[in-house]
Amino acid sequence: MSLKDKTQSLFAETFGYPATHAIQAPGRVNLIGEHTDYNDGFVLPCAIDYQTVISCAKRDDRIVRVIAADYDNQTDEFSLDEPIVAHDTQQWSNYVRGVVKHLQMRNKGFGGADLVIAGNVPQGAGLSSSASLEVAVGTVFQQLYHLPLDGAQIALNGQEAENQFVGCNCGIMDQLISALGKKEHALLIDCRSLGTKAVPLPKGAAVVIINSNFKRTLVGSEYNTRREQCETGARFFQQPALRDVSLNEFNKVAHELDPVVTKRVRHVLTENARTVEAASALAQGDLKRMGELMAESHASMRDDFEITVPQIDTLVEIVKATIGDKGGVRMTGGGFGGCVVALIPEEWVPAVQDAVSQQYEAKTGIKETFYVCKPSQGAGQC
């Protein structure tokens, strides 16, 4: 049963009338450009065919009722006329409440709604299930009430909700690609201007995501440390962000910086350059060059930004040894576990899957999860 069918039937069964709209917003994978977003840099993600789907309808009062199909049909209900506060026990509710609260600050022109939510974006894998939910909820109210908000505004609204209401410090990439993704394309995003450029993926290329299933523990504290180190670097150069520092400037004075900060800054500067070049390589159908850039990106995350773990490095080595120069593979996401992404010719998928299933668990004691994804359209009706 599709997510749409599942949410529509649960909607009718629970609320006693049919939903008028079904909205989807996808998860994402970042092909290259890691830890560049909060440095005002460039990222190159694509939306994937795993998504959050919400069946919904307007109400004629100011109440919002929500059912989470993936959490044993837990429910939430709140009024638009009362201050919206965090839910004591249901974390998923806070994503919905946060988005609605921040939407009210942007535009008061909407009333209540009934929502049933389901999704298949793997949680905790770094594929942005939370951003997908935030963008889906924002799109629900935008569509039901014809709010004059574009995809970028819905994305910013989701980011604000996550930063200020849920309390998780994230950049803008995840929400923006969920809102604006384009089928069969990646999106080069300038995280300062929020400008986007659609980049076609080479014909016959598959996006493969492999979850290491290594439980991420350090991700929150270490993420914040990396941000602070980058901010220290930007202050040293008296610039608002590392985006504004050139590699030449950096190389001249790198020896004056704290050695750890030097490594962090070098990663961000070189990763920005790689990301812009990767967009050109993809547009020219040059998977070989894309593969080289992904390999450089992974080495930089491992050695300079120090956010990989042995299990992730093992996965990358297995895939790289299998595909050679036929494509690329690197860690993707915040780090300390999570997933690797590979961009490879479709005909190489079985060989990669075989190699990983034969070697990864034997070397690490953990069984991976393998996803083959299609670059998909951003949020909208489904």
UniProtKB/Swiss-Prot annotation:
Q: Where does ATP bind?
A: 124-130
Sequence positions that bind substrate: 34-37, 223
Query: Which PROSITE patterns would you find in this protein's record?
Result: GALACTOKINASE, GHMP_KINASES_ATP
Cysteines paired by S-S bonds: none
According to the UniProt record, one GO cellular component term is: cytosol
Quick one: which residues bind Mg(2+)?
130, 162
Pathway(s) annotated for this protein in UniProt: Carbohydrate metabolism; galactose metabolism
Active-site residues, as the UniProt record annotates them: 174
Among PANTHER family, the record links this protein to: GALACTOKINASE-RELATED, MEVALONATE KINASE/GALACTOKINASE
Protein name as annotated? Galactokinase
